[in-house]
UniProtKB/Swiss-Prot annotation:
The record marks 25-26 as: Cleavage. This is Complement factor D. It comes from Homo sapiens (Human). Serine protease that initiates the alternative pathway of the complement system, a cascade of proteins that leads to phagocytosis and breakdown of pathogens and signaling that strengthens the adaptive immune system. In contrast to other complement pathways (classical, lectin and GZMK) that are directly activated by pathogens or antigen-antibody complexes, the alternative complement pathway is initiated by the spontaneous hydrolysis of complement C3. Disulfide bonds join 51-67, 148-214, 179-195, 204-229.
């Protein structure tokens, strides 16, 4: 059995007493309009927010593979229809995870292939506050300067404050050549990855696995790589979903 498969089994069977800290790295953003992003998911470990996610089909949520690294002994669930993580909302529902499918080439020590598909225990109840997001299938780069939306429940300042309500920020896409400069990510950004500017506004810890949405279409997923949030020389890194269209389709089939 593949190591990721063993991990996924442990995730679904275990139940730990405490939750792991949120993974990933919205900084400098603002509170989102309630339920205006019905595709948003909170991937939770033992009842606490761990990572972002995006509903891509009635029974499937896309997130980041690295999110499971801290989850081997815990119970993973997915919260849909939420704006506030703690307050009661008619649209909120917590789903168990039937199957966790990390990309087969994902590895703990690299940001490449950092994708994870979570099959919900049943099809989500769709409505105005819960709806899948169309995702990009055409494998082409988003034009530099395009403003894209990132949303999540990740930390909102360098002191580590975690929001209860969904936050979002608009970020311009950065060209790959600039992102690969020695002073930035020094050649690490492959054609399967993309960058967005991070000058005091950025995705941050707890946002990993969340969506980068450009023109109403899912273009990228926040990676879990470790870096300083909001540093303009360390732009945000996102996995391009179009590069993995065949894999996503094969899992969802």
């Amino acid at each position: 059995m593949h190591s990721w498969e063993r991990l996924a089994v442990l995730v679904l069977l275990g139940a730990a007493a405490c939750a792991a800290p949120p993974r990933g790295r919205i900084l400098g953003g603002r509170e989102a309009e309630a339920h205006a992003r019905p595709y948003m998911a909170s991937v939770q470990l033992n009842g606490a927010h761990l990572c972002g996610g995006v509903l891509v089909a009635e029974q499937w949520v896309l997130s980041a593979a690295h999110c499971l690294e801290d989850a081997a002994d815990g119970k993973v669930q997915v919260l849909l229809g939420a704006h506030s993580l703690s307050q009661p909302e008619p649209s909120k529902r917590l789903y168990d995870v039937l199957r966790a499918v990390p990309h087969p080439d994902s590895q703990p020590d690299t940001i490449d292939h950092d994708l994870l598909l979570l099959q919900l225990s049943e099809k989500a109840t769709l409505g105005p506050a819960v709806r899948p997001l169309p995702w990009q299938r055409v494998d082409r780069d988003v034009a530099p300067g395009t403003l894209c939306d990132v949303a999540g429940w990740g930390i909102v300042n360098h002191a580590g404050r975690r929001p209860d309500s969904l936050q979002h920020v608009l970020l311009p896409v950065l060209d790959r050549a600039t992102c690969n400069r020695r002073t930035h990510h020094d050649g690490a950004i492959t054609e399967r990855l993309m960058c967005a500017e991070s000058n005091r506004r950025d995705s941050c810890k707890g946002d990993s696995g969340g969506p980068l949405v450009c023109g109403g279409v899912l273009e990228g997923v926040v990676t879990s790589g470790s870096r300083v949030c909001g540093n303009r020389k360390k732009p945000g890194i996102y996995t391009r979903v179009a590069s993995y269209a065949a894999w996503i389709d094969s899992v969802l089939a």
